[in-house]
Amino acid sequence: MKNFVAGAQSGRKIQSGGCAIHCQDCSISQLCIPFTLNEQELDQLDNIIERKKPIQKSQVLFKAGDSLNSIYAIRSGTIKSYTISESGEEQITSFHLPGDLVGFDAITQMQHPSFAQALETAMVCEIPFDILDDLAGKMPKLRQQILRLMSSEIKSDQEMILLLSKMNAEERLAAFIHNLSKRYSARGFSAREFRLTMTRGDIGNYLGLTVETISRLLGRFQKLGVISVQGKYITINDLNGLIELTGTNKTKITLVK
């Protein structure tokens, strides 16, 4: 962490779990580390990145207590972060999409405080932390981008706390769907149609709701004509109606990452 502190549309495709991302011609680089780097700096970063083989569904990327060796940039697929309580209960803390980086929360103690597990087949870029830290000390733009990404993660965590403490069940689920819509849109996918890569149980765990409540609310939203649900696929029919269900005017929650 020493060097980080020192610098201290129409026609879009439907997300289906298979968008690959590459540094040189990345279409969503503004969401990842390469954003703002010039060609020479990008080459230096590219040289330290290890492009791993596919991570299979349910495979764990790292476990709580593991030493921080690398930061992981998701190229495709979805990964969830979660902790396990002393009583053995899982608590999901985040869902990571292509373009997201996983592992920043380990910098404080240099070990991971949570688990990271693939919800579907995923591809990641592994970025050795020591080398990244060294490069960040030499490349101001890289350092600034890393700080920006870390700040965004903190902001998202704060908004999630507000969501859980101030919103009722209906508002939580509506905000979750709306946030996914915005995140997929930022990645070049359709904001209107997308696939839920997480189970309803996972969604309920994340939002502090039961599976039955999630199913009931999805049915209610569908009856209202706000969304259509076909298995794991969601279609937003009435965006303004969905936003109204979030109670956004009351809570001012954005929840984009």
Swiss-Prot record:
Residues 167-240 form the HTH crp-type domain. Residues 23-32 are annotated as: Essential for the oxygen-regulated activity. The keyword Transcription applies. Its cofactor is [4Fe-4S] cluster. Keywords: 4Fe-4S, Activator, Cytoplasm, DNA-binding, Iron, Iron-sulfur, Metal-binding, Repressor, Transcription, Transcription regulation. It is found in: Cytoplasm. GO terms for molecular function: 4 iron, 4 sulfur cluster binding; DNA binding; DNA-binding transcription factor activity; metal ion binding. [4Fe-4S] cluster binds at residues 23, 26, 32, 125. Residues 143-162 are annotated as: Dimerization. Binds 1 [4Fe-4S] cluster per subunit. GO terms for cellular component: cytosol. Residues 200-219 bind DNA. InterPro entries: cNMP-bd_dom, cNMP-bd_dom_sf, Env_Response_Regulators, HTH_CRP, RmlC-like_jellyroll, Tscrpt_reg_HTH_Crp-type_CS, WH-like_DNA-bd_sf, WH_DNA-bd_sf. Its main location: cytoplasm. Homodimer. NCBIfam families: PRK11161.1. It is involved in the activation of genes necessary for anaerobic respiration. This is Anaerobic regulatory protein. It comes from Haemophilus influenzae (strain ATCC 51907 / DSM 11121 / KW20 / Rd).
